[in-house]
Amino acid sequence: MMIPFKVKTFSFLLACACSTAGMAQVGNDSPVKQVKISGYVGTRITDCIEHRVKAQDVDHLVEPFRHQNEKSRWQSEFWGKWIQGAIASYRYNRDPELYQIIKDAAESLMATQLPNGYIGNYAPEYQLQQWDVWGRKYTSLGLIAWYDLSGDKKALEAACRVVDHLMTQVGPGKVDIVSTGNYIGMPSSSVLEPVMYLYNRTKENTGHRTKRIKRYIE
């Protein structure tokens, strides 16, 4: 579907932009499978994808996850934010080169997962502080988005393990999540978003993980 840009189509474009926020939801019954925007806005979108999304040094985003020595900063949010944008871009243009970039980015990130499930860059004694859980949220969202696009079960498993590990640290009898991080735990508590997405994707299973995620939500 080719959409020429006009002022009267602004509401349609806004709806398209907002629809990416629901990318991690299950199911899409829309008969529209792809939209192509032309004109000035279409050119700007293409330029953004070519010269910003595809040009990103992905290894630079992954590198912090290879070193668990952070105490306070938020580098761990960037990979998850970038890959969600890259996946939305791929859904728009179906560029096979971009797909490979995304695939490589996901596999590089998953390779940093520790045996206990942690994916992040905070030193063990500083985990749960500052922006650590916030970064885990974006990591999980990015892995889920890749799973939704590719069907790669390794990504879903990696995201589940991230949450599994977090639940060994927070919850009843452990650290109260609202006491972690900044702003009375609001950034940390937003990890509930990927937790709910994981529940939606694993609730048909009867294993311990699904029950633990359900209990965490409740």
Kindly label every feature range from the protein language model.
Residues 1-11:
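Bacterial N-terminal signal peptides that target proteins for export
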Residues 24-218:
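Glycan-recognition and catalytic cores of secretory/periplasmic carbohydrate-active enzymes
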Residues 11-19:
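Bacterial N-terminal signal peptides
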